[in-house]
Regions:
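Metal-dependent phosphoester/phosphodiester hydrolase catalytic core
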Residues: 1-234
Length: 234
């Protein structure tokens, strides 16, 4: 929102060939004025509300409400059904089950912040609240064409991610310690969610689609912007 406009949402809303929208998270960002992605907010007349980083329930509600004021986003929701799932920024940057990179002790218990984010999410997003608010994984069947599984890889079972900065000593990378830590029993989706997915995948569908928040494989992108003048682009 503060970093730019949602014209892509408008194009999706107006495309009659699109019947369903999947949103895989980072629907909003938690940063306050002066934080990540807000450099052009004043120039674009898209200041964040509240101006602080969102932590309380009222904060999260206001930020959701702010995003919903965008006319292109409103159009998208009015024209297309959306199946959403959260990523990290619906809570805080690089969140995991017991914390987040962008959460500090002076902001209170992360569990409280997480509960605030969850409540606001279910209030403002097109999704039914489950008996257990954290269990967002669910399955959709679209005729006999495809089955869609929406998973959680952020908030329920995810262990704290390794920080590469912790493995540099005297300018050298401690590969031995990194490999040792990497081989520990670490979790991402959890036993319960994995068993649910394994049990519910049905071969009668032509396609089985998994919607979740993180990359499953390395991504190679062309070095377009390093070769061209960045001032040539808006």
């Amino acid at each position: 929102y503060p970093a730019g406009f949602f014209n892509a949402y408008r194009e999706i809303a107006l495309d009659e060939d699109i019947d369903l929208v999947l949103h895989l998270g980072d629907y909003l960002y938690e940063y306050g004025a002066g934080g990540y992605g807000t450099e052009d907010a004043k120039k674009l007349n898209r200041a964040v509300d509240p101006i602080n980083e969102i932590v309380s329930l009222d904060d999260y509600r206001k930020r959701h409400a702010l995003y919903k004021t965008d006319e292109d986003l409103q159009l998208l929701h009015s024209q297309k059904p959306m199946i959403p799932v959260w990523d990290d920024h619906e809570f805080a940057n690089d969140s995991w089950k017991n914390g987040a990179e962008n959460h500090s002790y002076d902001e209170g218990y992360f569990s409280t912040r997480k509960a605030n984010a969850l409540k606001a999410y279910y209030e403002w997003m097109p999704i039914r609240e489950s008996n257990s608010k954290l269990k967002i994984w669910r399955k959709f069947e679209i005729g006999n064409l495809f089955q869609l599984f929406m998973l959680d890889t952020r908030s329920i079972y995810r262990d704290k991610q390794l920080n590469f900065d912790n493995y540099f000593k005297n300018g050298l990378f401690d590969k031995k310690q990194y490999i040792k830590d990497l081989q520990k029993k670490r979790n991402l989706v959890g036993t319960e969610q994995f068993k649910w997915l394994d049990k519910n995948i049905n071969n009668k569908f032509k396609w089985s689609i998994i919607g979740q928040q993180i990359l499953l494989s390395p991504t190679v992108l062309p070095k377009i912007f390093s070769e061209l003048d960045k001032n040539s682009f808006p």
